[in-house]
Structures are given as structure tokens and as C-alpha cells.
Amino acid sequence: MFDPFLDQLHADITARGGTPAEVPDGLAECHSAKGASVIRSWLWQVPGFRRWRVTRLDAGESLQVLNSVAYPDYGFDHPLMGVDLLWFGARQKLVAVLDFQPLVQNEAYFDRYFDGLKALNRQFPDLNGEETMRSFDPNQYFSSWLLFCRGGAEQAQTSLPPAFSAFLKAYWALHDAAKNNPATIAADEVKRLQENYDVYSAERDPAHGLFTSHFGKNWSDQFLHEFLFPASGQS
């Protein structure tokens, strides 16, 4: 279901000069005990970003997942990029979240960085559902203009592919524009806010339960704190 999206994301990263980085030991790939599920992850070094992670879970008709978060270098104060795509094949259910994840919540920051996402929100009405995400506070590390959908096969096949492509294009444009506009948040504060994002997300990550059900608690806890949100595991 999501392999074309994965290929497009990796092609974009590579075209931008991205090179593979080492995933923590034992976390690059894991198979479920029954062999029905496999999860693979990649870590990228990309110019302008201190960390870019990608994860793909394939559990056949039961579940398909694509997740990615891009952390800009501390010298940039623009939003993180967040992608969460889940497909439950047996139920023909799509959950999609595409967002520029803001470091702070204020109008000046939104005016500076969110014109592109606002335009996408208008362009793809199937993915601007007003239903609030249940596991997260939309007023912290999420924007009001995220592309969000709890839909079905129609959205997965018709709305999501062009929205995903446009979303990546808009985020690259955001990053390119930020190169020419000095950050208004100091680098040490950006570092603190990105670390807080990891802590906040690890406490609320709705995918952790899914990973645990497929790959066990011990591996999934390590994956959560060492790969997905590494700052959450620091004392």
C-alpha cells in the first residue's frame, strides 16, 4: 500500500544529498514471532537536518504503516515534518496525518512558516477533516492546518497520493526559504523544543501499542526510546 510513498520519500531525500546513517543495533529490522509482520527503519543524514527517520511496517492485510519525522538542524527554527500513514486492509480504513509540526504556537510563527500547508489544506478537502486526533493535543506540536483523514479506500487511492507529493514539495520549499531567513528562535532553544517534542510524543505515541502487539514490549520500548524519540530516553 505505502511502498510508492516510501520510494518517493527516499528518492527526495537522496536527491537532496541524503546519505544513510546507522540505525541503533537491533532496530533496523524486526520480524514478529509468527513471521506475519516485518518492520524496517532507516535513518538519514540530510543537509540542513540533524536527523531524518523513516519507518515502514508491513503486516499484510492486517496493517500497513509509513511513518517519518524530519528534525531540522538547530540553526533552523522552522517546523519538523511529520508523516503518519496507517492502512487497515481488512476494514478498508485509512488514517493519515501529514503536518508541519510547529515548535511554538504563536501567530508570528504561523505567519512565517505555514502558508504552504494552509494552501494544501484548502486544496485537499478530503484530508482536512475536523475530527481531532484523540491521542494528541492539537495545540502542542501540531498545527491547525494538518492534513488529517480517517477515511477509506477512495481517499487512499485518489486523494492521498497527490496530497503526499504536494506535501513533500511544500516542506522542501519551506526549508529552502528558511535558508535565506535567519531564525528568530535561538539554537539552544530550538534544541530544547525538539527534545521536548520527543518526550511529549513518546508519552502519547498511539503507534506504540500497535508495535507492541506485533513485536513485543521489550523491543517496542527500545524502539520508542532509542529510535523514534531518542531524547525521551535521556536522563
Curated annotation (Swiss-Prot):
Q: What is its EC number?
A: 1.3.7.2
Keywords for the protein's UniProt record, in alphabetical order: Oxidoreductase
Q: Name one GO molecular function term.
A: 15,16-dihydrobiliverdin:ferredoxin oxidoreductase activity
- So what does this thing catalyse? 15,16-dihydrobiliverdin + oxidized 2[4Fe-4S]-[ferredoxin] = biliverdin IXalpha + reduced 2[4Fe-4S]-[ferredoxin] + 2 H(+)
Check the record and name the InterPro entries matching this protein.
DiHydbiliverdin_OxRdtase, Ferredoxin-dep_bilin_Rdtase
Disulfide pairs here are none
At the top of the EC hierarchy, this enzyme's class is: oxidoreductase
Query: What the protein does?
Result: Catalyzes the two-electron reduction of biliverdin IX-alpha at the C15 methine bridge.
Similarity remark: Belongs to the HY2 family.
What is the name of the protein in this document? 15,16-dihydrobiliverdin:ferredoxin oxidoreductase
Q: Which organism is it from?
A: Synechococcus sp. (strain CC9902)
* Gene from which this protein is expressed: pebA
